Amino acid sequence: THGESVSPSFFEQLQQTTQASGPLAAAQMVADRMRAAGRYPELFEALKMQHRIELGLPAVHTTNLSTGVPDPISDDIQDRLDKKLIEACREVGTALIKQGKLQEGWMYMRAVGDSRATSDAMRHVDITQDNLDTFLGLLVHEGVDVRWGTELSLSMRGTCNTITMLDS
């Protein structure tokens, strides 16, 4: 469940995995655990660590303590890391949206820049009066799928309210 804490035995397993198979296997173990638990923001952090390790970087971003300047990363490695982080954003954002956590999911999907994938994920969520404003905000004002948002507004709010929405 989302509120469950990580047990001490999990930390022991993590330590054993790190010693036996290395930090990448441990990072993958954390990602798998967070994915299975539906803890998507934590999954994103685990995927960041995993991808940094895959690219030969420290698990977390480091800064030179004496200068306060971030440790340099080559352009090639940075580009590869950025691509992996976009894929992590896609996975986490899609999962959150499908859970009905539209705003949380959009925070990740905005970085992906794939309106179609966002719209597709949103189609898995039941539209209610409680989430209609969020749907319309993302579909119309954020430009995820203006056509669907307009059709949705027309069917649920009528012509006058839709015109007002489109004018704002």
Give the ranges of each region predicted by the language model:
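Long, low-complexity, acidic Ser/Pro- and Gly-enriched intrinsically disordered regions
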Residues: 1-110, 116-168
